């Protein structure tokens, strides 16, 4: 039986009463709570601007939020315990990877160097896992990074991000540049990682093809509020809809209608009203 490295931790991700805002802006999250068990594959869904990327970055330890117990990954503080990321136990792959070098900031991955130079430059890697990922992502080690397409560059970056056997993986729209075959093969690899090693994955995406049988959990965010968090097979709407896309589309359309109703009517300024803007005419 395969060893489940992360199974010793019942709650792989735990967020308790989280509040967060950027600078002096209104809070994005207020009293936000989320619990995910080890081995789960959670889809994170919501409209653009709902807070998905911010939540993933908080879970990845990129933003400090409250005390050490507010955001816990593998029973450790996501922000304060830097060993989580340094050890590879916690890994984050975001959309910015298509143009930047991981934690190296805004350094473009378009220099004249090979895919082999990048992939084999990561030390302490299991050769079998490395070869498996190279084959899985159909990477040509002779690719020159300044000449490849965005999709090919994305494959190299995903490979580098998965070389260390993670325990918690946070994915933010990482498959947008991949073709159908590469995307489905990668999802199958992720599923094996969860089932065989007990790893936990949170995946934010707007592409829902094939995810009905892939995900184990779903979390739906609207305006920084967790509207739903449940096992996929316990969501009532899925039992009466043809697919996941239809369900999420209905949720997003519903929240759009509510937003339109709550928008304030524009203030109309009349020449007969006392107004600073009309002082010119008086």
From Swiss-Prot:
GO molecular function term, any single one: ATP binding
Q: In Gene Ontology terms, what is a biological process of this protein?
A: response to far red light
> What does the record note about the induction of this protein?
By sucrose.
Sorted alphabetically, which InterPro entries does this protein's record hold? AAA+_ATPase, ABC_transporter-like_ATP-bd, P-loop_NTPase
Please give the GO cellular component terms listed in this UniProt entry: cytoplasm
What compartments host this protein?
Cytoplasm
Tissues with expression: Expressed in root elongating zone and root meristem, as well as in elongating etiolated hypocotyls.
Entry's family note: Belongs to the ABC transporter superfamily. ABCI family.
Q: What name is this protein filed under?
A: ABC transporter I family member 21
Q: Look up and give the organism this protein is from.
A: Arabidopsis thaliana (Mouse-ear cress)
């Amino acid at each position: 039986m395969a060893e489940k490295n992360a199974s010793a931790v019942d709650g792989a991700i735990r967020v308790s009463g989280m509040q967060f805002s950027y600078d002096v802006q209104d809070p994005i999250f207020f009293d936000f709570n989320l619990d995910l068990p080890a081995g789960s594959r959670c889809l994170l869904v919501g409209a653009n601007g709902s807070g998905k990327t911010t939540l993933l970055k908080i879970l990845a330890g990129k933003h400090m939020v409250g005390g050490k117990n507010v955001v816990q990954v593998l029973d450790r503080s996501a922000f304060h315990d830097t060993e989580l990321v340094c050890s590879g136990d916690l890994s984050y792959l975001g959309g910015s990877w298509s143009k930047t070098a991981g934690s190296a900031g805004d350094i473009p991955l378009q220099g004249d160097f090979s895919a082999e130079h990048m992939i084999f430059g990561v030390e302490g890697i299991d050769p079998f896992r490395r070869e498996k990922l190279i084959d899985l992502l159909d990477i040509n080690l002779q690719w020159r990074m300044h000449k490849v397409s965005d999709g090919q560059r994305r494959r190299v970056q995903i490979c580098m991000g998965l070389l260390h056997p993670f325990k918690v993986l946070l994915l933010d729209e990482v498959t947008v540049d991949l073709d159908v075959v590469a995307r489905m093969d990668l999802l199958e690899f992720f599923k094996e990682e969860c089932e065989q090693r007990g790893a936990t994955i949170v995946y934010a995406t707007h592409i829902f093809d094939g995810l009905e049988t892939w995900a184990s959990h779903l979390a739906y965010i609207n305006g920084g509020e967790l509207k739903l968090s449940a096992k996929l097979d316990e969501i009532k709407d899925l039992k009466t809809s043809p697919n996941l896309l239809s369900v999420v589309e209905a949720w997003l359309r519903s929240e759009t209608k509510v937003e339109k109703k709550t928008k304030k009517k524009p203030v109309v300024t009349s020449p007969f009203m006392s107004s600073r803007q009309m002082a010119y005419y008086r």
